[in-house]
Amino acid sequence: MGLLWYLMSLSFYGILQSHASERCDDWGLDTMRQIQVFEDEPARIKCPLFEHFLKYNYSTAHSSGLTLIWYWTRQDRDLEEPINFRLPENRISKEKDVLWFRPTLLNDTGNYTCMLRNTTYCSKVAFPLEVVQKDSCFNSAMRFPVHKMYIEHGIHKITCPNVDGYFPSSVKPSVTWYKGCTEIVDFHNVLPEGMNLSFFIPLVSNNGNYTCVVTYPENGRLFHLTRTVTVKVVGSPKDALPPQIYSPNDRVVYEKEPGEELVIPCKVYFSFIMDSHNEVWWTIDGKKPDDVTVDITINESVSYSSTEDETRTQILSIKKVTPEDLRRNYVCHARNTKGEAEQAAKVKQKVIPPRYTVELACGFGATVFLVVVLIVVYHVYWLEMVLFYRAHFGTDETILDGKEYDIYVSYARNVEEEEFVLLTLRGVLENEFGYKLCIFDRDSLPGGIVTDETLSFIQKSRRLLVVLSPNYVLQGTQALLELKAGLENMASRGNINVILVQYKAVKDMKVKELKRAKTVLTVIKWKGEKSKYPQGRFWKQLQVAMPVKKSPRWSSNDKQGLSYSSLKNV
């Protein structure tokens, strides 16, 4: 056997050498016809000469005295070798113009050449064969054919491809279909039907790789053919539209100064149309970019939706734009089989504002900022500002008004409120601020009529200071008499103002006079330790409500009242 193969090889090389000097039509390596097959599966390959390069078929050529010769070049080799047709079990054989592998092996990968010749004529072509190793899930480097079907558009079928000629029509092979790694059994809208796979109303979820495994017997052996088809669900024809230009549009103006970079995107949406050639291009003043003297760069990008609707973007850019460039007409064009569309970009030169406008804007901005600052300052320090104005520019209310007291203090007669009035309020208002207080229990004479003396004291006072607490609202108390008298005096004569100081919160407001007073008068809240500091907010609010006095009744040397440190101990 070895001697016979050696003699055949010598004969083959002799034939090649004898025709090396003869003219032979060499069609080269037909890379468009690269054949991929799985390892350990049969393969049948027809000589491409009779399919693409010659006008006659094998029978005509054979009857004319032409001989078909096969040889190959191993992968990563340059030496042409004859094909060994004497392998065990006829693993490689030739039948007319077909080369058979039953089955293929990985080392069968290489370039195969079929040559048709006689003594006066020679023609040959080569094609690559790649044997691919199969994994457990049909994934490999093999390129799969793509079958497109319209979304929600009737019933579609795919057929197991490239199985014709492997077995006679009398043989009924078994066929198993898979999606990815999963055998197709009881799928929602996919039904295997032998060599066919039917899709009922295709959906995007049907996208994927579908594999058919065909098993057939031959000469006592079982062979398997594995074929994979990529299914892609695409947009329906009823949704097909002419191009839709998203950008440029009438809402966007590209305003640039000379020397700046001008960038204009032309963004176009194409609905899916089978075999449609989608185009996008720019014109500048009616000319293509290559026909104008402007230094223009155009970059294109394409993206696809799940149903292969296409968004194509062409970005036109000019690095340093000139005034002349800003006067040009830039138009985006688009076309598909449904029609054409175009949209001009709005480009203009930016107007630089005059200098005085900038200065005016800056001045206005500064004014607004100053006003805002003043409003904030007033909001934070309004009490201090009012007290400052009263101290320096206010009119003294105590001159010739016939009043004896600055403040009449009304409060509930119990230990806690009395301590707050006699120690805290009196200590600060009289000793620190110089006001004269009228406190009934301190200033009334023994034996007098309470009602008459109360009304008399209130009429002699400029302010009625009401210390609110839960005990204050009890019916029948002297405190309520003082409140009613003060409110009536304020309403009828207007010669006394009422000041409400909330010493403790009053939840149930049953006294209608007090309820009405709280709705129209400001309530100054005592907050315990936080309010004891004489320069704090509580005392400033109280001072604002007090009568304006130009100078205290006592000099600072006569003040022997409470200091802040003494208030802390109250």
UniProtKB/Swiss-Prot annotation:
Enzyme Commission identifier(s): 3.2.2.6
Keywords of this entry: Cell membrane, Disulfide bond, Glycoprotein, Hydrolase, Immunity, Immunoglobulin domain, Inflammatory response, Innate immunity, Membrane, NAD, Receptor, Repeat, Secreted, Signal, Transmembrane, Transmembrane helix
A GO-annotated cellular component: plasma membrane
Extracellular-side positions: 21-367
Coiled coil: none
Top EC class for this record: hydrolase
Active site: E482
A GO molecular-function annotation: interleukin-33 receptor activity
Parts of the chain on the Cytoplasmic side: 389-570
Region called Disordered, residue ranges: 550-570
Residue intervals passing through the bilayer: 368-388
Tissue expr: Detected in lung, brain, spleen, thymus and liver. Expressed in brain endothelial cells, astrocytes, microglia and neurons. Isoform 3 is predominantly expressed in brain; expressed in hippocampal neurons.
Single biological process term from Gene Ontology: regulation of postsynaptic density assembly
Region (Essential for interaction with PTPRD): 69-85
Disulfide bonds: C24-C122, C47-C114, C137-C181, C160-C212, C266-C332
Compositionally biased intervals (Polar residues): 553-570
Catalyzed reactions per annotation: NAD(+) + H2O = ADP-D-ribose + nicotinamide + H(+)
Organism domain of life: Eukaryota
Primary role: Coreceptor for IL1RL2 in the IL-36 signaling system. Coreceptor with IL1R1 in the IL-1 signaling system. Associates with IL1R1 bound to IL1B to form the high affinity interleukin-1 receptor complex which mediates interleukin-1-dependent activation of NF-kappa-B and other pathways. Signaling involves the recruitment of adapter molecules such as TOLLIP, MYD88, and IRAK1 or IRAK2 via the respective TIR domains of the receptor/coreceptor subunits. Recruits TOLLIP to the signaling complex.
Subunit: The interleukin-36 receptor complex is a heterodimer of IL1RL2 and IL1RAP; the association is inhibited by IL36RN. The interleukin-1 receptor complex is a heterodimer of IL1R1 and IL1RAP. Associates with IL1R2 to form a non-signaling interleukin-1 receptor complex. Interacts with IL-33-bound IL1RL1 to form the minimal interleukin-33 signaling complex with a 1:1:1 stoichiometry. Interacts with KIT (independently of stimulation with KITLG/SCF). A mast cell-specific KITLG/SCF-induced interleukin-33 signaling complex contains IL1RL1, IL1RAP, KIT and MYD88.
Similarity section: Belongs to the interleukin-1 receptor family.
Protein name as it appears in the record: Interleukin-1 receptor accessory protein
